[in-house]
A protein has these predicted regions:
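Active-site catalytic microenvironments in core metabolic enzymes, especially phosphate/sugar-handling
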Residues: 1-203
Length: 203
């Protein structure tokens, strides 16, 4: 079985051919009787998922859900406080260290970092929610220029730590949880974590 965060297919398909890498990959799995499970949004939203792991990695305390799901206690993004306020430069260095990134992109709104909103993957659409939650800084990925401009001039520091960089911390946690569940269920199975290559990186 292959467990992934991102699905290979996002849009519905009517047939599968070998004309695209996505279809070829899934056909290879089918031919070799390999099941594929892609968690994606459910893992983003659930308590203990992508955003909780990201918030914990950064060191946020007293975290709350940034964008609550309808009818549930979970949802997208988290917002919490640092143990001690710091400058954006200091916080940026912290982000690079804990997420193991060589580079990040930051927009400086001139505020010290104390209350931080995070959304793993692509969460730039939630700038208004971050501001409404009282955050002074927002960490996410896939930030466009005009989105960053809106954040900075609205008084919100913004950090693009890349889509991949903000989600990768979840992988080892997920593998450990699956291994524990298998062991407690009496299954003799090995959980292997694939070496992740960075799709986009500074050269």
């Amino acid at each position: 079985m292959l467990v992934t965060h991102h699905p290979v297919i996002f849009d519905p398909i009517k047939k599968m051919t070998d004309r695209s890498w996505q279809h070829k990959l899934l056909l290879d799995c089918a031919e070799n009787k390999i099941a594929v499970y892609s968690a994606h949004t459910s893992l983003d939203s659930v308590l203990g998922g992508v955003n909780d792991v990201l918030a914990e990695k950064i060191g946020l305390l007293l975290t709350e859900v940034l964008v609550p799901a309808a009818g549930g206690e979970a949802g997208l993004g988290r917002v919490g406080c640092l143990h001690e306020p710091m400058t954006l430069q200091e916080f940026s260095e912290k982000i690079k260290t804990v997420l193991k990134l060589d580079n990040i992109i930051a927009g400086d709104a001139g505020r010290r970092v104390s209350k931080v909103a995070v959304c793993g993957g692509a969460g730039a659409e939630f700038i208004d929610e971050a501001l409404a939650a009282g955050a002074d800084t927002f960490v996410t990925g896939d930030v466009k220029y005009h989105t960053a401009q809106n954040a900075v001039y609205s008084g919100l520091n913004i950090i693009d730590a890349t889509h991949q960089g903000t989600e990768l911390p979840m992988i080892n946690t997920l593998a450990d949880r699956i291994a524990l569940r298998l062991t407690s269920g009496g299954f003799n199975a090995q959980v292997l974590v694939a070496k992740e290559s960075k799709i986009l990186q500074c050269l």
